[in-house]
């Protein structure tokens, strides 16, 4: 599974997932399913944010080409992928600037158009079950929940799916592709079932060539969302109100 993840996902997503697991004291060599799940969740969050802006009229628009002269504001603030300290700094800054209620748990995104935090979920189970689990944990009407599955299903708070159909279809297609790639290599069952995961781990320890023939079909292009986060948590210059909350990192 580890080899699959490293070949299937953008290197920067893999690096962020490694840092996240290290921060929580988890071993990606052992918890390979969690490694894959974190990478998948990160990618969905970035895809959710990519290309979405707010123009001068306050309207949400989709722009796929970078135009440095365009007076556009990123619609979504990315919180997922940052270390906990910086993530809470961003959340606090958003709350102070917008008057939004501070969430009890770290959300994944903030939507400047709808003025709400968003919790993104990616599940291997039934979407409604995972949605209820998220809702019971968060217990806040101010955090919008949007759940995606690997089968193309989705569920969102009050059936408000936030994004346009094409943007959501892009996410669903990517998730379905990941599932198919896992299934082709005998990894899907272990990804879904803990019992199968233990069996798969034993196989992985015996053979490190499980994904040797994996074709690298995924684009290595760094998404706009990922560029904002590189090389670390640099000032993205997205809004003047949040600018002071981001730490400057020395150039490498």
From Swiss-Prot:
The record marks 195, 198-199 as: Important for efficient shutoff activity and nuclear localization. Keywords: Decay of host mRNAs by virus, Eukaryotic host gene expression shutoff by virus, Host cytoplasm, Host gene expression shutoff by virus, Host mRNA suppression by virus, Host nucleus, Host-virus interaction. The record marks 28, 65, 202-203, 206 as: Important for efficient shutoff activity. It is found in: Host cytoplasm; Host nucleus. The active site is at 80, 108. The probable endonuclease active site in the N-terminus and the basic amino acid cluster in the C-terminus are important for the shutoff activity. The C-terminus acts as a nuclear localization signal. The C-terminus is recruited to host protein complexes involved in nuclear Pol II RNA processing. Belongs to the influenza viruses PA-X family. This is Protein PA-X. It comes from Influenza A virus (strain A/Beijing/39/1975 H3N2). The lineage of its organism: Viruses, Riboviria, Orthornavirae, Negarnaviricota, Polyploviricotina.
